[in-house]
């Protein structure tokens, strides 16, 4: 099952230029890629201009000498419904804040604010609780590293006890 997401840019008029992404919408997927690869207004604008996505990749443009279409796409390259699949009416849309929260059945919503920081919300569980994406990913990494350290300690203790 897909983890769907909306990707948006806060506009000066108070609205949000928004596209849909069908796959890997969780913070360690789409969130991490947005934070590391689409961290400037210019890069995000280029992404939004592609319209709705099947897959968000680290790169926008495919190698023109290789196939890049649905079920045969280039790894780490964004797969856009309009450009790569041939679907119609997939362009970015402008939403008010209220409409953004109700725009789709997305699991997560990511917004690059006017201040240049990525924020996100779990639209299914807490749609009005926004978190700083960078801080949240850092916390998840630290928690994961701590858990791995605990597992290594348990494994070492188990080896010591069995000797």
Give each language-model segment a name.
Residues 1-3, 104:
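Residues that act as N-cap/strand-start positions at coil-to-secondary-structure junctions
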Residues 3, 25-34:
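Extracellular/luminal recognition modules and glycoprotein regions
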Residues 4-9:
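Short beta-strand scaffold segments in enzyme catalytic cores
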Residues 10-15, 112-116:
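Short acidic-glycine loop/turn motifs at beta-strand connectors
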Residues 16, 20, 108-110:
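Aromatic side chains
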Residues 18-29, 126:
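Short, solvent-exposed aromatic-acidic interface loops
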Residues 37-152:
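Low-complexity intrinsically disordered segments
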Residues 153-163:
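Non-Sec secretion/translocation targeting segments of pathogen effectors
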